[in-house]
């Protein structure tokens, strides 16, 4: 039997971002891995004008179907989505597409007919909280009902963690398979020093500057320790939420920590990010909520000591191997930081943990898992058809 033809729906990428976006990187990783697949030939669905950007994410010239997302069948995008009508259906048939994957379910423009075995990948459902906070309750109810109607049409969901799977089941009453992320590092790449912290001891946090990422607790923990440790706090993120960043900066000013805290919103290269990880005395991940949590694993793979908040998803994806703290307690975080800085894990412990995560979160493992999930669903449909 020949290969299946898989369409990776990248139409949720509608502009070239000013800074890296994790769900865009995720699509690039899938394209990189699927290129080597012996099961699938892959085509990307790409918005007009973004051909080169998608190629840069994938690292090669991807086979593409290029679309204008304003094109419709019924003159209504909403009706097209409701009826699963695709303006480029002839192109899908010409390429003999068997399976469609949408790597980011929230921004999905297209809902594909049943014959295309459409799979949605769910990273988290945090958008519901954001929407509820910023929208009048009646409008929120209407939007929620509309999304519920659309998502009932999707047969296959894939969650990036068991915790996301549970949340999807609770909120959408939809079960899903679990497929973990892979580590997006090129381990052959030489590190490039970040001059602003060369020769300085620092604690690192790599996250968006959004309040639920909980950098405030980390800042306040540093304040508790400022006379006991020499470290600065290096907060690496992006200015996607300016009000939240301004609030965090005001906390630093209030505590008179401006000389001890660095906010870095620049576009660091992968070589610079690797340097930041490997030269930190400690990476702290203080999040109150995550869909997966890449950064603790990235740091541990690079053999940096790591401390994580005790939320279930971080304990899940780190296999219960990392020390934890109560993310609502400044005192607990300060105590745990001081303990690890005083008694860091041994070189042997770090190497063992790095090897574990590097194998568990390999690109090959991710693509093998995705392949098994899709083949399982195709078999279930074929068996059901025969019956």
What do these predicted regions represent?
Residues 2-387:
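Carbohydrate transferase catalytic cores enriched for Leloir-type hexosyltransferases
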């Amino acid at each position: 039997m020949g290969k299946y033809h898989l369409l990776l729906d990248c139409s949720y990428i509608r502009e070239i971002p000013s800074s890296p976006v994790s769900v865009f990187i995720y699509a690039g990783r899938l394209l990189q891995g699927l290129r080597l697949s012996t099961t699938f030939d892959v085509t990307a669905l790409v918005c007009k004008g973004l051909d080169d950007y998608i190629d840069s994410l994938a690292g090669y010239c991807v086979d593409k179907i290029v679309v204008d997302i304003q094109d419709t069948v019924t003159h209504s995008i909403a009706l097209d989505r409701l009826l699963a009508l695709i303006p480029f259906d002839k192109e899908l048939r010409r390429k003999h597409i068997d399976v469609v994957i949408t790597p980011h379910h929230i921004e999905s423009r297209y809902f594909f007919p049943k014959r295309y075995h459409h799979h949605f990948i769910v990273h988290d459902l945090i958008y519901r909280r954001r929407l509820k906070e910023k929208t009048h309750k009646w409008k929120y109810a209407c939007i929620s009902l509309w999304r519920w109607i659309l998502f009932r049409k999707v047969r296959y969901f894939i969650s990036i963690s068991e915790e996301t799977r549970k949340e999807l089941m609770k909120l959408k009453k939809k079960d899903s398979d679990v497929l973990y992320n892979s580590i997006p590092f090129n381990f052959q790449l030489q590190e490039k020093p970040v001059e602003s912290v060369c020769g300085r001891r620092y604690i690192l946090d790599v996250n968006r500057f959004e309040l639920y990422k909980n950098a405030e607790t980390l800042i306040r923990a540093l304040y508790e320790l400022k006379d006991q440790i020499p470290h600065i706090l290096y907060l690496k993120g992006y200015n996607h939420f300016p009000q939240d960043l301004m609030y965090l900066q005001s906390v630093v000013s209030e505590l008179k920590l401006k000389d001890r805290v660095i906010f870095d919103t620049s576009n660091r290269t992968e070589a610079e990010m690797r340097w930041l990880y490997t030269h930190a005395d400690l990476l702290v991940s203080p999040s109150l909520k995550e869909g997966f949590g890449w950064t603790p694993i990235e740091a541990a793979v690079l053999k940096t000591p790591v401390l994580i908040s005790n939320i279930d998803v971080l304990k899940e994806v780190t296999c219960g191997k990392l020390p934890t703290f109560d993310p609502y307690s400044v005192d607990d975080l300060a105590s745990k930081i001081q303990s690890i800085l005083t008694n860091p894990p041994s070189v042997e412990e770090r190497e063992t943990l790095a090897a574990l995560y590097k194998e568990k979160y390999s690109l090959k493992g991710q693509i093998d898992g995705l392949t098994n999930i899709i083949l399982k669903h195709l078999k279930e449909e074929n068996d059901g058809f025969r019956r």
